[in-house]
Swiss-Prot record:
Entries under CDD domains matching the protein: F1-ATPase_gamma (cd12151)
Coiled coil stretches, renumbered: none
Quaternary structure note: F-type ATPases have 2 components, CF(1) - the catalytic core - and CF(0) - the membrane proton channel. CF(1) has five subunits: alpha(3), beta(3), gamma(1), delta(1), epsilon(1). CF(0) has three main subunits: a, b and c.
Name used for this protein in its record: ATP synthase gamma chain
Gene from which the chain derives: atpG
Keyword presence, Transport: yes
Recorded family membership: Belongs to the ATPase gamma chain family.
GO biological process: proton motive force-driven plasma membrane ATP synthesis
Principal location listed in the UniProt entry: membrane
Location in the cell: Cell inner membrane
Organism, scientific name: Yersinia enterocolitica serotype O:8 / biotype 1B (strain NCTC 13174 / 8081)
Signal sequence segment: none
Length: 287
């Protein structure tokens, strides 16, 4: 059994770590609230944009934009959204596992995959496991802006425009609630039709001003940008929620460990006192 002094040192060490994890839990809770506000503010725009674009995909368009047309799939692209920091449980690795499984499925069909990475964890992971990385951006912090995301988005859209990509997806964690975040792979291009069954039964027609091509060229790019930005803010809210939960679990585990060490310390101290008393009694008997 370890000595009482050594056990006291371990208890102090765990208590110090517990203070750190508690502080990190409180910081993550504060950041999560701000991230949720940002996510809630942008979600209606992103969902409305997706709904309008879904109507367009079902519409009788006088100009058929390339983003609306299905192609034979030879190469697909993924915009992968991850965190810049760790200590957020299995948030990143669960997302990467889902993506790797999908990439394996494409590979078995002879389809190649390009990756545009957002966040240092994705850059680190796919840099080690392999994958064709065509763009990456890291270090966006807790308040990302659309201008920081334009680089990877532009690279993937250019590849799609030039026919080097036949499908484009965004990969991110969707924020469900504080305790639940869901890894998601969502198709961006070609434009998926609206999922609502009632909408599919309707025929949509639009009048465009000034002309369909100019409007659709701009609108469809804005659609992709809005979905990527929403994916990033959802992932950020998921990160802070996962970190808060992970740090709370670490703090609680620290408390349990301290109790166990306190028991061991008490037993060690009791054994030490018993030994001292035995030595005193033995010495008195010898006299």
């Amino acid at each position: 059994m370890a000595g009482a002094k050594e056990i006291r040192s371990k208890i102090a060490s765990v208590q110090n770590t517990q203070k750190i994890t508690k502080a990190m839990e409180m910081v993550a809770a504060s950041k999560m609230r701000k991230s949720q506000e940002r996510m809630a503010a942008s979600r209606p725009y992103a969902e409305t944009m997706r709904s309008v674009i879904g109507h367009l995909a079902l519409g009788n368009l006088e100009y058929k934009h390339p983003y609306l047309e299905e192609r034979d799939v030879k190469r697909v692209g993924y915009l992968v959204v991850s965190t810049d920091r760790g200590l957020c449980g299995g948030l990143n690795i669960n997302l990467f596992k889902k993506l790797l499984a999908e990439m394996k499925g494409w590979s078995e069909k002879g389809v190649e995959c390009d990756l545009a990475l957002i966040g240092s964890k994705a850059a680190s992971f796919f840099g080690s496991v392999g994958g064709k990385i065509v763009a990456q951006v890291t270090g966006m912090g807790d308040n990302p802006s659309l201008s920081e995301l334009i680089g990877p988005v532009k690279v993937m859209l250019q590849a799609y425009d030039e026919g080097r990509l036949d499908k484009l997806y965004i990969v991110n964690n969707k924020f469900i609630n504080t305790m639940s975040q869901e890894p998601r792979i969502m198709q961006l291009l070609p434009l998926p039709p609206a999922e609502d069954g009632e909408l599919k039964k309707k025929s949509w027609d639009y009048l465009y001003e000034p002309d369909p091509k100019a409007l659709l060229d701009t609108l469809l790019r804005r659609y992709v940008e809005s979905q990527v930005y929403q994916g990033v803010v959802e992932n950020l809210a998921s990160e802070q929620a996962a970190r808060m939960v992970a740090m709370k679990a670490a703090t609680d585990n620290g408390g349990s460990l301290i109790k166990e060490l306190q028991l061991v310390y008490n037993k060690a101290r009791q054994a030490s006192i018993t030994q001292e008393l035995t030595e005193i009694v033995g010495g008195a008997s010898a006299v």
